[in-house]
Amino acid sequence: MDAFMEHAPDQAEDLEREYLKFNAEHLPDMVTEFEGIPQLLADLVEAGANLGVVTAKRRSVAHDTFAPANLPDDLAIAAAMEDTPVHKPNPEPILLGMKTIGADPASSVYVGDAIYDLQAAAAAGIDGVGVTWGAGVPEQVHAQPNAGIADTVDELRSILFN
């Protein structure tokens, strides 16, 4: 809603309604499983990792995103758009997410596909790992300071398990 208010305050409510309607109708066609991610998540949990999702999406939209992506049903949405008044690159969503799942910032890593994810991780004082698939612009992800960049799921696995 903030973006709509900023760019078209007189139409913000209508634009948000249309945006949510579009997501509800098209999300299953727009989101697909990234091969290897469900297994990587399972392996991380088996290794003792405490996992959670911090997203700029509304909680309901984030839940709807999981179904076509074949992500585990019990993967916690630790922080969603409505949970904080500010959003990435501000660190508040990541800090809230870590608190929600009981994660230790000293050993936490945030994986994201956009420059704002890596900026928020840095501002939260944790390592950020960029992936070049997803919604972000790979060149921007590569240009942002980070703890690693993964162009494939195997590269991400290597970074996270080292």
Where are these regions (language model features)?
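N-terminal helical cap/lid subdomain that shapes the substrate entry/recognition surface
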Residues: 1-47, 60-63
